[in-house]
Amino acid sequence: MEEGKVREYAERHGKSVERGDMAAVAGDLIEDLHPQLPTIGQILPNPCNKAEVLSVDPAEDHAIVHIRYTGDDKTVTIRSRWEERGSTPMIVDAAPVE
């Protein structure tokens, strides 16, 4: 996957989290992950004041992205796996970094 394209989508995803735009956040996830949105939402700071893409590590068929979410009460880094669906990078897996 192309790093620049994935980074662009990841940055946009982070901004959606900052705005609390859950429809846009859900749009970045494959359908199978939608039931996990409430759980993921509990992990993230609320409100999220800042989302920062820390790294984008592309491979041939996917990219691993680390995004740090900072709020008033906590900071959480999420590791996500992005794959192209059609021509659009989408999150196919995500979990907090320990």
Where would I find each of the regions flagged by the language model?
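Surface-exposed, charged secondary-structure patches
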Residues: 37-85, 93-98
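Short, low-complexity N-terminal intrinsically disordered segments enriched in polar/charged residues
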Residues: 1-19, 27
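A generic structural signal for ordered alpha-helices
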Residues: 3-4, 34, 60
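Short, non-transmembrane alpha-helical segments in secretory-pathway proteins
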Residues: 18-20, 29-40
